[in-house]
Amino acid sequence: MQENLKNDKLKIGKYEFDSRFILGSGKYSLELIKSAIEEAKAQIITLALRRANTGEIANILDYIPKNITLLPNTSGARNADEALRIARLSRELGCGELIKIEVISDSRYLLPDNYETIKACELLAKEGFTPLPYMHADLYAARAMRDAGAAAIMPLAAPIGSNKGLCAKEFIQILLNEIDLPIIVDAGIGSPSQACEAMQMGVSAVMVNTAIAEAKDIALMAKAFSLAVNAGRAAFLAGLASVSKAKASSPLTGFLRD
C-alpha cells in the first residue's frame, strides 16, 4: 500500500502532480504565501489575475516559487466571453494553459453560472487551454462541461468563503459516480476534517483558500490541511469498512455462562 501511495498521481489533462492539495491565494498577505505553500506541500496554486498586476501592488508572482504550477482563474468574469478574455491575458502573462473557469454574475450568493461556464469551456478548449470549470454540483452541467472539453470538474462544497463544509456532498457523490474526470472539491471547505472527509469520498483533490488565509497561524493550518488530504486519500485507497448493522469486533463466545 505504501508503494501505491508513492505512485498515486493527480492527473489533469497532460499534467501529473504528486500533491492532491491545491492552495488558493486570494486572501493572503503576499509575505505569507511562500510559507503557506511550503507547509502545504502544494504543487498547484490558484491565481486571480487582478492580483498579478505590475502597478503599485507587489506582483504575487514574485512570491510564488518557480517550481509551483500556476492555476490562474477567470475571477471577475460575468459571462463566457469575459472568461475567454481573461484566459487570453493569463496566457500572455506566461501563466500557461491550465485555467480555472470562474463565471459568476450573481453578486449576492457568488454562485457560479453553470450555463455560461459550459460555453466558456468550449471556447477555451478550442483555443488550446486546459479548462477546469468551477461549478455548482449538477450532473447535467458536469456532463456538458466534460463534452465541451473540461479536463476536470471543480464543484463547490458550500458557498465560497462560507467554511460550511460538504453541504453538497450527495451531489458531489453523483459526479464521482458518473463523470470520468478528476473531481476537485472547491469552495466552502472550512476545516482539515472536512477536507479529509472529501478525500475519503474519492475526490481527486481539494482546493482550500479562506480556511487557511483566515487562520491565526496560516503556515500551521496549511500543514494541517496537507496532512488531512493525505490521510483522506490513504483511507480511500485502503477501502473504508461499511456495514449496515452492528457487528462485534470480538467473538461472542458465551464464556460467562460456562
Swiss-Prot record:
Primary site of residence: cytoplasm
EC class: transferase
Keywords: Cytoplasm, Schiff base, Thiamine biosynthesis, Transferase
Entry EC number(s): 2.8.1.10
Transmembrane segments: none
GO MF: thiazole synthase activity
InterPro entries according to UniProt: Aldolase_TIM, Thiazole_synthase_ThiG, ThiG
Active site: 100
Gene Ontology process terms (BP): thiamine diphosphate biosynthetic process
Assembly: Homotetramer. Forms heterodimers with either ThiH or ThiS.
Functional summary from the UniProt entry: Catalyzes the rearrangement of 1-deoxy-D-xylulose 5-phosphate (DXP) to produce the thiazole phosphate moiety of thiamine. Sulfur is provided by the thiocarboxylate moiety of the carrier protein ThiS. In vitro, sulfur can be provided by H(2)S.
HAMAP family documented for this protein: ThiG
Protein's name in the database: Thiazole synthase
Organism annotation: Campylobacter jejuni subsp. jejuni serotype O:23/36 (strain 81-176)
Species lineage: Bacteria, Pseudomonadati, Campylobacterota, Epsilonproteobacteria, Campylobacterales
